[in-house]
Design a protein with these regions (language model features):
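N-terminal membrane-anchoring alpha-helices
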Residues: 1-46
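Membrane-embedded segments
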Residues: 48-143
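Short loop/edge segments at beta-strand edges and connector loops
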Residues: 146
């Protein structure tokens, strides 16, 4: 009887942990925006620091809301960056996504003193995204490195 109770408890605990991980993975983590600050270089330098904002892995998909992108843009602009660097994975699957004009409009709102730079992510190649990724990033004011 004790073994059965322990087994039931273990199964219930395992189920709750699994459900919690799935909930976190699909409902919390994709919408987190984290800002980390790093100071690099000589501390005694008299040069003004350069502020670089890096954005990555937005993974736009059919249930992606523009509120999320707007939050990212607002947060980045509040940091007053000298450069914005987008390091890929704009799309989750481009073939399932079609509202490029709204996306371009939002990305254009990113401001950087010296420019915006983008590189390709592994997800930016499939589903017809190669052609569109380059077009969208360039129309949004990014210099796409090849």
């Amino acid at each position: 009887m004790k073994i059965l109770k322990k087994l039931i408890f273990a199964v219930c605990l395992l189920f709750l942990l699994t459900a919690g991980c799935i909930f976190y993975a699909f409902r919390i983590e994709p919408f987190r925006i984290s800002v980390n600050t790093f100071a690099m270089g000589a501390e005694e330098s008299s040069a003004e620091p350069v502020k670089i904002v890096q954005i990555s892995d937005i993974h736009i998909k059919e249930d992606f809301t523009y509120k999320n992108l707007e939050k990212i843009v607002e947060r980045c602009n509040r940091l007053s960056p000298d450069f914005v660097v987008f390091t890929g994975d704009l799309y989750d699957n481009y073939a399932k996504y079609s509202d490029d004009s709204h996306l371009i409009s939002e990305l254009k709102k990113l401001h950087a003193e010296y420019g915006k730079i983008a590189i390709w992510g592994n997800r930016d190649y499939g589903g017809g995204a190669v052609r569109k990724y380059q077009e969208i990033m360039e129309l949004s004011g990014f210099t796409l490195l090849k």
